[in-house]
Amino acid sequence: MRLQKKKYYNHSYDIYDGKKIGTITFQIKHRILSLKYLEIIPEYRNQRYGEKVIDYLLSKNNVDCIVGETLKSSRGFWHKEIKRLNGVRVNTTYCDNTTSAFIIPKMKIDDLYECLSEIYHMLD
């Protein structure tokens, strides 16, 4: 599996495993991977490529946790991933079309807030 950076989009990558299987957009700051968008092409969804992508991100990148939000259409997938990787679901959202946020692996909200406040001084 490999990621290929898109030409004109910052932090966006195509996901390849011999052939293109999806698209991902993420940003890493202070060892926190902020997942913006993950799409697996429908014909590859039941072949565990979503799990493989998350495992790839955790192993290849120097990150402590993944932070993201759950779309209504992908709640089942994220529920399984949160349980599998000992994550936590948080009932706060930033976007209108999401149901909840998540942190994988589990990290105290206070610790995450401290990391984010170092990045964004306006949170204080």
Residue ranges and their predicted role:
Residues 78-82:
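Conserved active-site tyrosine of GNAT-family acetyltransferases
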Residues 60-72:
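Conserved GNAT acetyl-CoA-binding A-motif
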Residues 31-42, 69:
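Conserved acetyl-CoA binding element of GNAT-fold acetyltransferases
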Residues 115-124:
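Short, cationic low-complexity segments
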Residues 69, 84-110:
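Conserved catalytic-core motifs of GNAT/GCN5-like acyltransferases
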Residues 1-32, 36, 123:
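Acetyl-CoA-dependent GNAT
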Residues 53, 74-77:
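Conserved short alpha-helix immediately C-terminal to the canonical SAM/SAH-binding motif I
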